Curated annotation (Swiss-Prot):
This is Copper transport protein ATOX1 homolog. The gene is atox1. The keyword Chaperone applies. Cu cation binds at C11, C14. The keyword Nucleotide-binding does not apply. One of its GO terms (biological process) is copper ion transport.
Length: 67
């Protein structure tokens, strides 16, 4: 399943932090980060949107589920 999130990223460091968190989760793949539009998309075979959102929130950035 593919999920999209709004993440209030302001720099490359923010996007790297989000990528690092998602990359460590088993079953997450195809991570795409659009820094300009503050959008993060990924595929997950084991985790739902709410669980992914909780992990992204560990970066300290405001975020919400888009789809």
């Amino acid at each position: 399943m593919t999920y999209s999130f709004f993440v209030d990223m302001t720099c490359g460091g923010c996007s790297k932090a989000v990528n690092a968190i998602l990359s460590k989760i088993d079953g997450v793949s195809n991570i795409q980060i659009d820094l300009e539009n503050k959008k993060v998309s990924c595929e997950s075979s084991k985790m739902g949107a709410d669980e992914l959102l909780k992990n992204i929130q560990k970066t300290g950035k405001k975020c919400s589920i888009i789809a």
